[in-house]
Amino acid sequence: MASTDPYTPPPLPSPFTNTTPPPQLLTQGAEAHLYKTVFLSPSAPAALKVRPSKPYRHPILDRRLTRQRILQEARCLVKLVREGVNVPAVLALDWEGQSGEKGFGGAWLMMEWIEGMVVRVVLERWEKYMKRNQAGLGAEEFEKEEARVRDLMKRIGHAVGALHKAGVIHGDLTTSNLILRPPTRAEQQPAADETNPSMEGDVVLIDFGLASQSLQDEDRAVDLYVLERAFGSTHPRTEPLFTEVLSGYKESYKGASSALKRLEEVRMRGRKRSMIG
């Protein structure tokens, strides 16, 4: 019989145990927990990513892996910020043993809080809006709607291109790891799903837990392939417009054409694996 006990997250690192207001748990994954907290001032929101220790691993190996992974993520973010790519800025980080903290056994990374809506939600809301209203839209209105989403797709391509130009591979490119940051706070999206969402603003890449540094076309192509598959499984209505993502990507840096050529090979391998099962 399944347990009905509420989930209890692991203890917070000591710097955050008495924070006011307390950190708010947003998501929990196999490797990390994401909280919303504040940095230095109650009016300055921040994202806190906590990597708890893994009791099933040898303690020495666990500490080494946790430290390596949090540092790898932070280094990628710092490099991208320096290159002008839209990603959260690193505010602070620590791991067990660095500050003498005992009992926590993990690592944490505090980052700039990115206001906005996840691109997955934006596209899902737009698809629902179009499904409900398509019959009532005239040809001109339909073209305007499609032009809006094409522009967003191209901006996604520009964002991924800027990432790869800087020599960083995301490792988990999905629309859940892209945030559409509105130009002003006044343009925050309403909560109702019935609305037609705004698509204005910058595309910000988040969640670099699987990121690495590489200039290899193969790695770039796999990154793009993961994003393409994400569109196919999550956004069937906008999947045919994925060519706009690739168009924006091609415009973003000189070596993009080589990565796109390699993408064709990655697609072929993916199709063969699907056929074999």
From Swiss-Prot:
UniProt-annotated catalytic positions: D172 (proton acceptor)
EC number(s) per entry: 3.6.-.-, 2.7.11.1
Entry-linked Gene3D superfamilies: Phosphorylase Kinase, domain 1, Transferase(Phosphotransferase) domain 1
Biased composition (Pro residues): 7-24
Record has Acetylation as a keyword: no
Name under which the protein is recorded: EKC/KEOPS complex subunit bud32
One GO molecular-function entry: ATP binding
Pfam family, any one: Kdo
Coiled-coil segments: none
Function statement: Component of the EKC/KEOPS complex that is required for the formation of a threonylcarbamoyl group on adenosine at position 37 (t(6)A37) in tRNAs that read codons beginning with adenine. The complex is probably involved in the transfer of the threonylcarbamoyl moiety of threonylcarbamoyl-AMP (TC-AMP) to the N6 group of A37. BUD32 has ATPase activity in the context of the EKC/KEOPS complex and likely plays a supporting role to the catalytic subunit KAE1. The EKC/KEOPS complex also promotes both telomere uncapping and telomere elongation.
Membership in a protein family: Belongs to the protein kinase superfamily. BUD32 family.
